[in-house]
Amino acid sequence: VNPKDFKKTMEVLEKIGKVDHHLVHEHHGMAWVDGVTVEPHYKVHNYQSPPTDYAMQEMFASVFPSELSSADMDGYAVPVFPPTFESVFLISHMVNHVYEEGLGLRQVIDYAMFLSSCADKIDWLQHHEYLHLMHMERAWRIFTCICVDYLGMSLPSQVESFSHQEKVWAEKMMADIMRVGNFGRGEYVFHHHGFKDAFNNYCWVAKRCWNLGFVCPSEARWWIISKVKRFFWKKSFKK
């Protein structure tokens, strides 16, 4: 959604469904229409490191809408991003989950399915350039290693074999996925009812950034800084 149209979009959704105005995130709102969750994005995604965030917004602008293709799903034409961008976006989305609410196995499976189907369609030189700009080369290697070593995906011919250190990182990340899971449901669930909840939420994020900083060091560092604003400053502002 174009940022200038976001308010109007939410008004339309409120007429045909339910909108939770307290769940407006840093890049999207939340609504439910006929039992289906709808996330109107006014920004493709939000990253904590300013250079990483800038790189993604520039990459997104370069492919949307001019580079979209169309895929048929049950007779409906669905817009699809170029495979190169899609791969990098999936990786970056997983990184976000790692440092906040937890990464789910289903998200890694999504990437394994995507890579199994689209590896030959990716422009790998551009892919590496995108990852470099996002500071996410290591995260990509770790997630791809999990796909190969734990999910049984064949190593794409375009991807180099993994080092011992990468396998160690993948094992640690996989252990966290199995223990914590998507949105932290296996270990911790965010609550938003006062300062104590804000403090507990922040401690959870800071601990994850410390323990899993190896996945994407630049984002881990910035999460610790930026979430002070999200969990405390906004809470004080509302009061």
Residue ranges and their predicted role:
Residues N2-K239:
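Conserved NTP-donor binding/palm subdomain of two-metal-ion nucleotidyltransferases/polymerases, i.e.
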